[in-house]
């Protein structure tokens, strides 16, 4: 993992600017409002049709490079098209206890940052960064125009393949419902309280830290647990799992072009299109197998028993069970489609479909009420397929499955 620092752009700027000038991709304006500026002429270009004043200033008349100009240099480096590399050193990660570490928060990948000189650099890090097969910039949709400029600049600099490998993962903004904003301590006007959602704004001083959001979610999850199980001792690890699941599903269930108005109560609901609903389904499947084993009955199928399910008579595999199999069978296709379109919401919708299949299976095909061993085995197999599918999809979404809800 690499921190983006000024050093990267400082070293890359002269080379990228020379490439753009040599290719005729930027011109020095001598008159008009952009006199003295280096400008990328975009008027009439296909991606910018219909735009007024589409031309983009890359370097101002006082020699200052604009953000977009820096992003062009950074993009060319990420694509490996600058023909240079930098010196790197491990960057300290400071844990919540204030102790400096050289391990990332996930306990695996070291963090690196660039250096201006070789002294103290890690030679093994050279060549590890930049030159990606694809470069995916995760930036909100309001930056679509600058990102189009960056892509066009890469193309005009003489790297059409690099432009094709440049992807803007655009997403709409994340806002808060008025009730959630006030819950987090944001002071709202009467006008703001009447809105569908409240935008975060640095200019207005409206902002929420991610840590505060998660902390409040954990508190609300504990309240949910105590409401459902009065007298229960609060289980922090379970509340954290529910809170993280609620947040991740809520943030990914919408398509990228939809504004997300985050609401605590809706996110933590145990019914509907929510993380707790999916976690509950996963926990219940595990509970069913555990109860079967407690009764001395077969639980999870082993490989040999699972292989024998396909040989069962069709009478034991009715339409209800086949519907479950078909739903779960679309998992790989859904993964591929989500990766191809960068639409994570497809995974959430699939997980919800599997969750609905579980609830249908639970109510219409109870294992203990099966007529015989063959029918019971078919129902166990369908339930096991649901359990593994939920585990796979929730795992990709980063949604933890607690031991109990």
Write out the residue ranges for each language-model feature:
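Non-catalytic interaction-recognition regions
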Residues: 1, 6-405
């Amino acid at each position: 993992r690499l921190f983006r620092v000024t050093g990267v752009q400082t070293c890359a700027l002269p080379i990228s600017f020379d490439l753009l000038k040599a290719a005729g991709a930027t011109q020095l304006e001598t008159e008009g409002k952009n006199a003295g500026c280096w400008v990328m002429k975009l008027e009439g270009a296909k991606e910018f049709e219909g735009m007024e004043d589409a031309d983009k200033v890359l370097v101002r008349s006082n020699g200052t490079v604009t953000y977009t100009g820096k992003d062009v240099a950074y993009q060319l480096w990420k694509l490996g098209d600058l023909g240079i590399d930098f010196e790197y050193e491990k960057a300290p990660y400071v844990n919540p206890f204030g102790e400096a570490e050289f391990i990332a928060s996930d306990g695996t990948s070291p963090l690196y940052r660039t250096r201006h000189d070789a002294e103290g650099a890690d030679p093994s890090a050279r060549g590890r960064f930049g030159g990606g097969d694809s470069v995916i910039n995760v930036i909100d949709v309001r930056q679509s125009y600058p990102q189009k400029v960056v892509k066009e600049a890469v193309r005009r600099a003489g790297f059409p393949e690099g432009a094709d490998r440049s992807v803007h993962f655009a997403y709409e903004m994340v806002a808060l419902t008025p009730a959630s904003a006030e819950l987090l301590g944001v002071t709202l006007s009467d006008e703001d309280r009447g809105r569908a959602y409240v935008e975060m704004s640095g200019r207005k001083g409206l902002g929420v830290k991610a840590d505060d959001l998660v902390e409040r979610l954990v508190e609300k999850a504990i309240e949910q647990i105590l409401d459902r199980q009065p007298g229960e001792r609060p289980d922090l690890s379970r509340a954290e799992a529910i809170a993280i699941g609620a947040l991740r599903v809520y943030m990914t269930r919408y398509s990228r072009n939809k504004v997300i108005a985050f609401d605590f109560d809706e996110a933590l609901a145990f019914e509907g299109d929510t993380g707790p609903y999916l976690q509950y389904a996963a926990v219940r499947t595990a509970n069913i197998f555990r109860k079967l084993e407690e009764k001395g009955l077969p639980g999870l199928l082993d490989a040999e028993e699972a292989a024998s399910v396909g040989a069962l008579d069709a009478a034991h595999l009715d339409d209800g069970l086949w519907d479950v199999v078909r739903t779960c069978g679309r998992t790989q296709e859904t993964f591929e489609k989500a990766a191809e379109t960068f639409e994570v919401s497809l995974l959430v919708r699939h997980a919800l479909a599997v969750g609905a299949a579980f609830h249908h299976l639970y109510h219409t095909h109870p294992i203990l009420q099966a007529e015989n061993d063959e029918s019971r085995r078919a129902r166990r197999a369908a339930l096991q397929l649901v359990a593994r599918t939920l585990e796979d999809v929730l795992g990709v979404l980063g949604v933890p499955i607690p031991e109990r809800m």
